Amino acid sequence: MDFANNPVIKKQIFFDEEGKAKIERSLCTDCLSCTKVCPAMAMKQQGKPMEISEIIDHVLRQELFYHHGEGGLTVSGGEPLSHGDWLIRLLKEAKKHRLHTAIETCGYASYEVLKEAINYLDVIFFDIKSMNDEKHKHYTGKSNQIILDNFKQLVQDAKTTKITARTPVIPGF
């Protein structure tokens, strides 16, 4: 395969001065084409696309394992809030079946999505990597302001949803 002239690689993947492959994530459309042309085969699609009804059916078949506890449906990432419309549809369907619902989020999303999701969530695991904006920018490339603003608003708005704030403990971070 001619990787140098492959349109996916030319658009999304490039090599820096040191010869390291870099991905231009802002151009990513989640088409997964890069997984088909990765010369080192380091990029792979994990999981499989599923319809909401398939996900709910799968979770319901596992009910024996979580019936007496708080098991159910937990949506994690990437970032579930970045797929707002789909997430809301999934959570609504889960609630129709009286499933316990949770998400794991870093909170870097539009608050409007989070505000609507609250109505269908029992638990939110909210990851705050750093309270310090400079450290957060240094290690993630993004300000933490949206995250902290969303968390503050969430605490005010989520009357019946359990919120667990999590912070990773990483030496030197």
State the predicted function of each range.
Residues D2, L32, G84, I88:
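Conserved active-site region of classical short-chain dehydrogenase/reductase
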Residues F15, I23, H136, T140:
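Short clusters of hydrophobic/aromatic residues that line enzyme substrate/ligand-binding pockets
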Residues C31-C34, C106:
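Generic recognition of cysteine residues
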